[in-house]
Structure formats: structure tokens, C-alpha cells
Amino acid sequence: YSQNAPPNIRKVRNEPETPSSSESVIVGAKVTDPDGVRSVTLEYCVISPGSFVPAKIPHPVPNIPVNNPQQDNPDYEKGWVSVPMVKNGNQGEFASGEDVYSALIPPNENRSLVRYRIIIEDTKGVRARAPFVDDPSLNFAYFVYNGIPNYEGQAGSSLEALPVYHLITRQSDHADCYAYNGGKQINQGTQARFYYNWQGAMVYDGVVYDNIKYRLRGA
């Protein structure tokens, strides 16, 4: 219990939802506090293609200690950039509406994963971060994507008739999960077969589900 709660933040979003590599992105949110809002700060981190950073360190395989919690990955907190968010700034769709704060993220290369979070503080110095500390997603995110490329003589536009999924993860984690190396195959009949040991980001229909956990199905 606290007599002074941190600012209230809601309606967090980014426009466009799925930018191309030539587009800047506006991040906006509505922030209010009865004591007044001192500052709203955007923190963002660009994950280049092929360089995914999990928030947790997976256990080594094949003998996964399923009862031991995974350790935080110190690399997750590296590379974040802080930008002040401006109240009712002239930022596209975020320009209208009271108590709306926004900031601009410059363009990034195709297939970049851009994570972001927002730090809010009231005039009495009470701070909070969104997503909140008990939110397993840890951050908001968007995926920079120029669309399906042409493939084997097939136009990318025709391939869009099927749903497109992206699993963004470390190559080493993906290899350990599939366990083409027989020495890393998890024994049948153990709880380790059902343990979600690896992290990634799933992208579908323009929405990023970051810091999800996965395992090999068929245990």
C-alpha cells in the first residue's frame, strides 16, 4: 500500500503497427496523475536481424534442471536508448487527445525487432514502468518488415494468401531445441521433455508476442 500511486498509463501503441525499413515509428500513450506528471520517457532497444537477445538464459541440455529458475540474461538490459516523450506533440494520430505523450523512433533495417518500454514519474517523484514489473512480456515491441520477398520464381504477393508466422530466436537455441546433435536430445519420459526452455518472439498479423517460451513438440 502506498498513499501516492505512480501515474496511470494506458492506450500504449505504436504507429504504424508494422513499419517498413523506410518508416519512422511514433510511440504514444495516455498518462495522467492527480499530482501532475513530471516526465514520460521512452526507452527502446533495436535487435538487429539474427541477433535476438532472450531475457532469460536457457538451461543447458539434455539434463535440464526443471525445478531451478532460469537466470536473467544481463545482455537484455544493454543497448536501450532513452527519449523524452512530448505531451500532445504534433505526432500524427497522437496529436489529438488530452494527456497524450509521444516520441519518434527512427527507421530501422528490414526484419529488426524493436523493443520499447515507458518510464513514468509524477511531480512527487513516484516512478513506474510499463509494462509493469509483474508483466511477463517485459516490454512492448514491433517488427520492421518489408513484406514477403519473391521466392523460387513465385511472387511474394501470391504467398500472402497463407498466414505468415515469424519465430525470432537465437540460432544456437533453435539448434538445441531441435537437437539434431544426438548428444543434446532430451530423454523420453522425463519432465525435461515438457519444459519450455527457450525464449523467442512470435510475430503474427503485425503483432509481436515477445519473450515467449517454447519447446520441441512431440515429447
PLM features per residue range, with description:
Residues 1-10:
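Proline/serine/threonine-rich low-complexity linkers at boundaries of modular beta-sandwich domains
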Residues 77-83, 89-104, 110:
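Aromatic sugar-binding surface patches on proteins
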Residues 26-32, 43, 104:
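Short edge beta-strand/loop segments characteristic of extracellular beta-sandwich folds
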Residues 17-18, 26-30, 112-219:
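Phosphate-handling architecture centered on phosphoinositide signaling
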Residues 12-16:
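Surface-exposed, proline-enriched loop/turn segments that connect beta strands in immunoglobulin-like
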Residues 23-27, 38:
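Structural beta-strand segments of beta-rich domains
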Residues 32-56, 113:
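Solvent-exposed loop/turn segments flanking beta-strands in beta-repeat/beta-sandwich domains
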